[in-house]
Amino acid sequence: MDDDTAVLVIDNGSGMCKAGFAGDDAPQAVFPSIVGRPRHQGMMEGMHQKESYVGKEAQSKRGMLTLKYPMEHGIITNWDDMEKIWHHTFYNELRVAPEEHPILLTEAPLNPKANREKMTQIMFETFNTPAMYVAIQAVLSLYTSGRTTGIVMDSGDGFTHTVPIYEGNALPHATLRLDLAGRELTDYLMKILTERGYRFTTTAEQEIVRDIKEKLCYVALDSEQEMAMAASSSSVEKSYELPDGQVITIGNERFRCPEALFQPCFLGMESCGIHKTTFNSIVKSDVDIRKDLYTNTVLSGGTTMYPGIAHRMQKEITALAPSIMKIKIIAPPKRKYSVWVGGSILASLSTFQQMWISKQEYDESGPSIVHRKCF
């Protein structure tokens, strides 16, 4: 395919949108999935105030805006804002006319049917795309790791899923979801930093805490041992400079924050941690494929980027699994973008070309065509 008919691959995350062209090895555009609106009329006088700002522009003007994420827990909840994000993706980030390109979108596992239909409808009716497809995020991550069978623990900003996949097909009966991911960890870090005497409350300050989390947090192999070490020495302490120049010190919060992934009770949640959820997904799968799942446990998404997370998963799952079972955790270095990369790979395959939903098929069958063609 030449660039004129290049396929667009858009991975809409709850926190970040990743977009680019199929065949590339990384997304061209990565920006926050946020829409900001001025807090007060006329507040931004002389700046040719717009009624809304998207992505990085919204982030840079965050002090004057109220920021909203149109996706919650991986599901689109505000369609008007989502359209603004897609519009921004096409016209400002990729600088393409969507009516000239097939578009591959990604979706959360167990995405409600109505949600998939609405995505399909907007692509064909609002953006007039010639063809589109919706792929499950975890399956794309598995492709990126060069596998078609395995279990993906995909954790982004909005949710965490454990998805067993056999020969390219996600197994919905064994797919589990945890409404605990990056955003909850950011909120938790805000809370425990407040206990240290630092105040973070606004949506703008939430973005600062997210940055602290991404730069300084890590997963301890043994959190109790780490707590004892943090209490007796300053070896885990790090400093961070806030935008106003104030420097703050952060200690055991560095590992207490992501520890909530393994102990959701830290957040007052009754659910199992990511290790137990992964194990439960494997046990819900057919007994004949469990061995393949244990040896092909793939981490994916920004919330799996903490240093130490793979070792800890290895330790925890080994403790849960039958003792004879070999456990292998795969943590690809660029796993933050592995969903997007999987989309880029899939859309480039010659065998995939007959999978597209064409405009003609859409016109004949309506939005429900998505359930027949994308599964």
Swiss-Prot record:
The modification Methionine (R)-sulfoxide is found at M44, M47. Oxidation of Met-44 and Met-47 by MICALs (MICAL1, MICAL2 or MICAL3) to form methionine sulfoxide promotes actin filament depolymerization. MICAL1 and MICAL2 produce the (R)-S-oxide form. The (R)-S-oxide form is reverted by MSRB1 and MSRB2, which promote actin repolymerization. GO terms for cellular component: actin cytoskeleton; actin filament; axon; cytoplasm; cytosol; extracellular exosome; extracellular region; membrane. PROSITE patterns: ACTINS_2, ACTINS_ACT_LIKE. Pfam families: Actin. Expressed in some hepatocellular carcinomas. GO terms for biological process: axonogenesis; cell motility. The keyword Cytoplasm applies. The keyword Hydrolase does not apply. The modification N6-methyllysine is found at K84. Keywords: ATP-binding, Cytoplasm, Cytoskeleton, Methylation, Nucleotide-binding, Oxidation. It comes from the Eukaryota. It is found in: Cytoplasm, Cytoskeleton. Interacts with PFN1 and PFDN1. Does not interact with PFN2. This is Putative beta-actin-like protein 3. It comes from Homo sapiens.
